[in-house]
Amino acid sequence: MGCYSMGFVGRKAGMSRVFLEDGCSIPVTLIEATANRVVQIKTSDVDGYDAVQVTVGSRRSVLVNKPESGHFAKAKVEAGRGLWEFRVEKTQLGSYSVGSEVGLSIFAVGQKVDIQGITKGKGFQGTIKRHNFRMGDATHGNSLSHRAPGSLGQRQTPGRVFPGKKMSGHMGAVRQSVQNLEVVKIDVERCLIAVRGAIPGASGGDVLIRSASKI
């Protein structure tokens, strides 16, 4: 069993840069970090594991189905734009209660964090863009195979395409994590947190922020 810690749900706001005291500028990603509301506390005795379920933001009532509406009503929490869970240690459950809020106080400047998001969708792409294949020669004798993927394998034996073969297909729109990003700045008044470097996804996408699991 690993070591779990509370996380935070934010929204990617975009990228900027921050000047350090020595005059160097570093790229940072700004994350909108409004307070997360606790919807449910899950315990190993009842649910089989210990976790804190949170929501953030708001959603129109017509977009909330009946099961979700009842779930939020039971917790007496305004319906948010989604539900997320963070595994925590059993000893940490006492720090949270249904209806309470989780803020940026769980992070500190200089701390290393892992951030998870959904990458930008690229649609259907060929092997050159999707898997960094080499292009065919752009010269005499090559008329239709400049971006062709090439051979898929052998002939009658084995007579099939092996699973996992790199081919054309849908690219992007997958869950991806970036580890060990440094927290550069925390602005509590503006509900912003700045981390060094880039994070997955487009501006406006939800991201999960956790304490770094590997340092």
Curated annotation (Swiss-Prot):
PROSITE patterns: RIBOSOMAL_L3. It comes from the Bacteria. InterPro entries: Ribosomal_uL3 (IPR000597), Ribosomal_uL3_bac/org-type (IPR019927), Ribosomal_uL3_CS (IPR019926), Transl_B-barrel_sf (IPR009000). Keywords: Methylation, Ribonucleoprotein, Ribosomal protein, RNA-binding, rRNA-binding. Gene3D superfamilies: 3.30.160.810, Translation factors. GO terms for biological process: translation. Methylated by PrmB. The modification N5-methylglutamine is found at residue 156. GO terms for molecular function: rRNA binding; structural constituent of ribosome. Transmembrane segments: none annotated. The keyword RNA-binding applies. GO terms for cellular component: cytosolic large ribosomal subunit. Part of the 50S ribosomal subunit. Forms a cluster with proteins L14 and L19. One of the primary rRNA binding proteins, it binds directly near the 3'-end of the 23S rRNA, where it nucleates assembly of the 50S subunit. Belongs to the universal ribosomal protein uL3 family. This is Large ribosomal subunit protein uL3.
